[in-house]
Structures are given as C-alpha cells and as structure tokens.
C-alpha cells in the first residue's frame, strides 16, 4: 500500500519507513501476504494508472521479487505507459505483454494471484497470438480463420472482439509514447545545434533540416 500511495501521489518514502519495510522483509512477513491482497492492490494500481511507478518503487525497496517474483529484474520497464480511462481489464493486458515469450511465468503469475479467469484467458490469448493480432488486417483468410477458431468467435465468444479492441489501444498507446519521445528529441535540436555562421532564415532552415534528418533514424 505504501508503494501504491507513493506512486499515486509522487512522494519520497522516508528512510525510517524504508528500514521498517526491510525489517519486515527480513522477518519473512512479506511471504505471508495473501494473494487476494496483492491482487486487490494491483487492481487499484491499474485504476490509478501508476503500475510503472509502483513496480519501480518496489524494485527500489528491494521487495519486488518477494511480492511479484514473476516480474523479474527490470522487466516492468517494458510495460507501455498507458492512457487515461483505460479499463482495468485492458490495463491488465498491458501488464501481460511483458510476458511475451514467457507464457509460463504469466500463467504462474495468474494462478498465484488468483487473477480472474476472464482476464487470464484474454491475456493468454493475446500472448499466444500477439504477432497475428498486431498484423490482423494483413492476415490471409487461413490465418484469420485460425484466430477465429482459437478465440471461439463462432461460439458467441467475445474473446476476439476484446483482443482486437485491446490491440487498438495498444497501438494507440505505443504511437503516443513514440510521439512523446520524438517530440523531446526534436526539441533538443535548436539554434545551438547548427553552425554559428548562419544568419536569419538560414538558422531556421538548418534546424528544420536537422530535425528531418533525425526523423530518418526512427524509420
């Protein structure tokens, strides 16, 4: 809870509090937290859209592996920064994407925390068919139909609809994050980045060209 509040309100955890947490860890009390409690805190983190900061704080406190051993090392850094008002279910799916090629860890994570079956099923389907879902509009009929079969589309299942809706948000989130990165990089190119011999309109033209040249690195 302390980590969640620190992530939400962006405050520094006092050294005394950090020591208390380390003492609790040393005594093994963290190992006795019930899975339902961990999942409850995680759902609140989803609603607050702060799970990146949340995991980062747990890592800094050296308790991440005690509470969420499946999210090993700095794997949480791969979680895409989300958008506001994204549903809890799709927030969970964003978290699930860090288990790409590590489905066994994802299943262990879900089973240990008693993740709702609906979330687990959707996350597993997305992981198993991530590349095809990303490239869905370019799939040939055979590969599309395979997705329909796997998702139970013809049995009135919403799995395929939910997966494609999530992929839509996933792409939008990635595009937004990439745009923010590009914006920051291009802003660093200014009058100090071009020859001091240039004058007037030449300066603006040179800055523009350097920014265009930089964009080629993103292709």
Which ranges hold each PLM region?
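Divalent metal-dependent catalytic cores for phosphoryl transfer on phosphate-bearing substrates
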Residues: 67-172
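A broadly tuned preference for mixed-charge, low-complexity surface segments
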Residues: 9, 19, 42, 49-67, ...
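Short, surface-exposed acidic
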Residues: 13-17, 65-69, 117-123, 200-207
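Residue-level marker of positions within ordered structural domains that often coincide
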Residues: 47, 63, 132, 197-199
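A diffuse structural propensity rather than consistent per-protein peaks
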Residues: 14-17, 34, 136-143, 190
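Short, mixed-charge aromatic SLiMs
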Residues: 22-35, 80-83, 112-133, 179-193
């Amino acid at each position: 809870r302390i980590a969640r509040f620190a992530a939400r309100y962006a405050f520094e955890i006092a050294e005394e509090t950090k020591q208390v947490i380390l003492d609790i860890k040393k005594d093994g009390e963290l190992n006795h937290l019930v899975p339902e409690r961990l999942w409850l805190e995680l759902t609140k983190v989803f609603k607050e859209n702060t799970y990146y900061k949340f995991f980062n704080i747990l890592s800094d406190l050296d308790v991440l592996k005690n509470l969420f051993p499946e999210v090993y090392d700095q794997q949480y850094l791969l979680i895409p920064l989300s958008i506001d008002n994204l549903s809890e279910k799709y927030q969970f799916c964003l978290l699930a994407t860090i288990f790409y090629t590590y489905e066994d860890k994802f299943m262990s994570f879900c089973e240990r925390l008693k993740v709702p079956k609906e979330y687990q099923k959707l996350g597993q389907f997305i992981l198993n068919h991530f590349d095809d879902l990303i490239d869905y509009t370019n799939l040939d009929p055979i590969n599309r139909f395979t997705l329909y079969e796997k998702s139970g589309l013809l049995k009135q299942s919403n799995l395929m609809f939910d997966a494609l809706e999530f992929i839509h948000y996933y792409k939008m989130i990635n595009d937004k994050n990439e745009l923010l990165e590009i914006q920051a990089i291009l802003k660093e190119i200014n009058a100090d980045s071009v020859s001091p011999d240039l004058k007037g309109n030449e300066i603006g033209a040179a800055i523009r060209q350097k920014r265009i040249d930089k964009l080629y690195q993103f292709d």
